Amino acid sequence: WQDIITIKTWPRPPAGLFFLRDFAIFLPDGTLAAAATSSWLFINRATRLPDRNAMKQVSLPYCHQSILGHDPKRLSENTGYEAMARVYPRFSDFDFHAHVNNSVYVGWIFDSYTSGFHEQHRPLRIQLDFIHELISDGEISIGMYRHGLIHHFEGRVSEKATLCFRALVEWH
């Protein structure tokens, strides 16, 4: 728990409406331990829609290096999801903008497994696609579709069946 790691991050030029940011995490010996790319967009607080004007006003020192070698692509829809968990967002799940933060979805997914599963498996790859903002504290249904050790997830507001996120976790 006392290891010192190095995290490097840099912005890449936007791809359409999305801004990209790459991350590289290195162990003390310089070995790459993890790599990630996030995509995000500016949202107008009043309309809750992408803000193209704000995008034009951003001036960042972009780096064209892609740590993954490709841009993130959306996960495709699957059928045959089985009910995995039901969760209720708590106050601490909401961010400054009063919606559930993407990192909370990963926690919900991981918490839906037994401790025995976690003792036998480690995540190899995680992908999370934000679909619709979650701003209520109602019940969220999490469904899972398994293909070997590749597990696909979707989270929906139970009351309206509104799709909030899709995710993929590959285990080893």
Show the residue positions of the predicted features:
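HotDog/MaoC-like acyl-thioester-processing domains
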Residues: 1-74, 134-136, 145-172
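Aromatic side chains
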Residues: 23, 91-94, 105, 130, ...
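Hot-dog-fold acyl-thioester-processing enzymes
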Residues: 33-37, 44-124, 172
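A conserved acidic, glycine/proline-rich C-terminal tail/linker
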Residues: 116, 120-147, 152
